[in-house]
Curated annotation (Swiss-Prot):
Gene Ontology cellular-component annotations: cytosol
HAMAP family: SHMT
GO BP annotation list: glycine biosynthetic process from serine; tetrahydrofolate interconversion
Compartments reported by the entry: Cytoplasm
Catalysed reactions, semicolon-separated: (6R)-5,10-methylene-5,6,7,8-tetrahydrofolate + glycine + H2O = (6S)-5,6,7,8-tetrahydrofolate + L-serine
Species whose genome carries this gene: Burkholderia lata (strain ATCC 17760 / DSM 23089 / LMG 22485 / NCIMB 9086 / R18194 / 383)
Annotated NCBIfam families: PRK00011.1 (NF000586)
Top EC group: transferase
Gene for this chain: glyA3
Domain of life: Bacteria
Protein name as it appears in the record: Serine hydroxymethyltransferase 3
UniProt main location, coarse: cytoplasm
Subunit structure: Homodimer.
Names of required cofactors: pyridoxal 5'-phosphate
Amino acid sequence: MFDRAQSTIANVDPEIFAAIEQENRRQEDHIELIASENYTSPAVMAAQGSQLTNKYAEGYPGKRYYGGCEYVDVVEQLAIDRVKQLFGAEAANVQPNSGSQANQGVFFAMLKPGDTIMGMSLAHGGHLTHGSPVNMSGKWFNVVSYGLNENEDIDYEAAEQLAQEHKPKLIVAGASAFSLKIDFERLAKIAKSVGAYLMVDMAHYAGLIAAGVYPNPVPHADFVTTTTHKSLRGPRGGVILMKAEYEKPINSAIFPGIQGGPLMHVIAGKAVAFKEALSPEFKAYQEKVVENARVLAETLVKRGLRIVSGRTESHVMLVDLRAKHITGKAAEAALGAAHITVNKNAIPNDPEKPFVTSGVRLGSPAMTTRGFGPAEAEQVGNLIADVLDNPEDAATIERVRAQVAELTKRFPVYR
């Protein structure tokens, strides 16, 4: 039926092929600094493009609603076993299609509409799914938000006071734009003191945690959710780790609760990524991720920019642009013209609108994947500062773009 030689994307759909080729060129030619993006391996992509995409497999390994699942059972069980080993978890569900759906799965399993949850404020670095009023989590539940103190660290004392006052059923830890280490043990004690579950969303930090360069929340939390891309460098998807006592309700919440048939080709990609993350090379990579982020932040500070929280202890940093009298939206556009990709991001107590912002968020995972070290991280920091010092100067943009081209040529993503 299908001739592999003839059924190529280029032959079947030249328009899609052209868009893919253009995106590949963009990824090779631009320096990627969006903290939630990374480059996955050819092995992971091959798994995602395999015949496993053809197979329906409602249920779980050994308990499927379809026949012919003996081989996809092997794939899913390998993914489960590997991710449990990677993070030291008692149980795992690898079927969530995203980090948001992983969070929804925990909510669906353990909460009822109207229950009180407590999460980090989106305005202070949290995530939409931690109780934002525009998200399902903020519409279905009564939300209490904690945030940062005057030093721009998590205000654990205020969080404890809020928990004592409001008695949430579930406390959410984790962030999407917070650079310091989170004290998961302290948050677990707060949760225990009020009889709340603790759910940690480690989506941004998962790769660092797997390598032991960031605190592991698994020993302290009832549930730990994550994406499988970002710093973990796998396919786009989600995972829930949990204590064994919660495995049955979580599994039921994912299927049949909020999802149908799992994406077995993506689960295969997850399994491959987990195997890669168990390697010594992955630990060395994550150590470089943290070092590159530190060098990048220090370089920006030397050039007159402020890092929210004063520093980074992870892969990510939030840059306050107000001293340069430029918005996040304008900075994103200017840097993009120089082939440096970032995202505009609100800073704590940001006076600008969400589509404008006073900051940008930067991350080091992708540039580290392509081989950048501290010297390149310092160079990138100076290139960013050069653009932000003269964001409307065409000559500056052209000069920086030429230096970016030299860097990306030296360090290709896919050889």
